[in-house]
Amino acid sequence: MTSNSFNPYDYEMHEDPYPTYARLRSEAPVYRSDEFDFWALSRHEDVIGAFRNVDAYSNAFGVSLDPSAFGPDAHRTMSFLALDPPKHTRMRSLVGKGFTPTKVSAMEDRIREITLQHLLPALEAGTFDFIEDFAGKVPMDVISELVGVPTADRAELRRMADLVLHRDDGVYDVPPEGMEASLTLIGYYQEMVDERRKVRTDDLTSALIDADIDGDRLSDDEIVAFLFLMVVAGNETTTKLLGNAWYWGWRNPDERAKPFEDANRIPNWVEETLRYDTSSQMLLRVARQPIVSHGITIAEGERILLLVGSANRDEAVFVDPDRYDLDRDTTKLVSFGSGRHFCMGAPLARLEARIALGELVGRVADYDVDPDAMVRVHSINVRGLASLPTTVVLR
C-alpha cells in the first residue's frame, strides 16, 4: 500500500473504513504513514498484544494523533487514559474508590427513568431524530447525573463535547472552536470541584474528592481531567453505540428481528454492534523501546495507531467478519481495550445500551430510517452518527 493509502482524517474513510482495514490486515499489518508520522497495527493479535504490553507501548503522550492532544501533558484532559504505570495504577485505583461497580449498578432504575424521559416524547411524535432526540441525550444525562451536573447545563455541555470531537474536512487537529470548548469544559468542572470541596453532595465528584488510599488523594487537576474524560469519551461513545445499533439493526432486518421477538437477545445486539462497528475506532500508543512485528522494526519514540475497528473485523478471529450476526461469539472483541487499560466505563456503557434498546423494543414493533438524511460524525477516534432520522411503528 502507498504511504497515503490510509488517512484517518479522510471523510471518505469515515464513511466506510472497513475495506481499507481489510487491505491493511492483508497487505500491510504493520503500516507506515510518512504523511502523518505514525505506524498502524490492524490485526487482532497485534492490537490486543499491544494493549496488554505496557512495557513496550506507552499511553503517556495520549491516545489521539491530533497534534494539540498529543504530548506529555495529555493526561490533563485524558486522565489515566494518558498515563503509564505506576502513575496509571495509582490514579485508576483512586478513581475506582469512587467509580465503583456498586455505584454503576445502583443507577439502573435512574437510567431507565432518564431513558423514558427522552424516549416517550420521541415515540409519541412517531418520526424523530434518533441521535438528537434520544441517543445523544440519555448518555449525557446519565454521566451528568453520576458526576452531579445540573439538568439546566447538560445540553450545553454536550454541545461542547461534540465540538471537541468534530473535524471539518481537511482539518488535522482540534479546531479552534474545539479548543475553546475544551477550555470551557475544564473551567466548568473546576468550578464544580471547588463547590464540592465546600459542600459535599451524593455524586461521583464528591466521592472522588473523598477517595483515599493510605492518605493519598486525587488533586483538583486529576479530578477535573477524569470528569473531562467522562463527558468527552464516555458520553460520546455510548451515544454512538446506540446510534450504530439502531442503524445496523435497520440495515439487517433478519438480525433485528431477534431482539424484537425476544428481549433476552438485546445483549447480543449490543455486543455485535460493539464488534461490527465500534464507537472507538483507533487509539494511539508510543513505542517505549524498539518493537519488532512481522519483520519490521518500529523505533523507540515512534507513534503507533491500534486499529480497534480493524481488529474486530479480523477474519482470523471472527468467521465471516463483515456479516452483522447476533448469533456469533463476540467474546474476543477489543472495543473496550484489554489489560490494564480496559475501559473502566464499559459496565456503564453496556448497562445504558441494554436499558435504552430494551425500552425501545418493548414499545416499538418496527421502524424505518431515512439514510439520505443521515449525518455522520467526522472524528479520527470516534465513529458514529450525528443525525439519524427514524420513524417508528408502535406495538
Question: Regions from the language model: what does each represent?
Answer:
Residues M1-R395:
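Cytochrome P450
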